[in-house]
Amino acid sequence: MKKWMLAICLMFINEICHATDCFDLAGRDYKIDPDLLRAISWKESRYRVNAIGINPVTGYGSGLMQVDSQHFNELARYGIKPEHLTTDPCMNIYTGAYYLAIAFKKWGVSWEAVGAYNAGFRKTERQNQRRLAYASDVYRIYTGIKSSKGIRIPATKKSLPEINSVQNN
């Protein structure tokens, strides 16, 4: 029984370590701060590889980065199946980084684009509020991650600092 529990614990630890490396790799490949990807993953799934989150508008989100089911048809063209997103942490992290990179390309490297990762691009007051709330949550998580590494990020009360100034700290 103890050996069985140890084996499960080691598999879980291995999966987390593997996923941690994937944040760094995806960040490098998409030129996104890996800690920003980590912050989004914590906000979306609390780092749960097999997380499923219901989205009343589009269906559901899958895995660490909560990749939305609305993208499944597009992802299928690349051989990515929904089950890959809840069983392969690297696939999920890279897919999330891909969609964040699309948001950055569309709206620039900004907290508004981070908000669009979750709330989409529709330009309505409600969506603007959802983007800001999401980006603010991610920013708080992100600064916590940076702080744990001894990196200070300027606090601001009015608005979020420019994302590039934060990433370069």
Swiss-Prot record:
The keyword Repeat does not apply. CDD domains: LT_IagB-like. InterPro entries: Lysozyme-like_dom_sf (IPR023346), Transglycosylase_SLT_dom_1 (IPR008258). Signal peptide: none annotated. Gene3D superfamilies: 1.10.530.10. The keyword Cell cycle does not apply. Keywords: Plasmid. Belongs to the IagB/IpgF/P19 family. This is X polypeptide. It comes from Escherichia coli (strain K12). The lineage of its organism: Bacteria, Pseudomonadati, Pseudomonadota, Gammaproteobacteria, Enterobacterales.
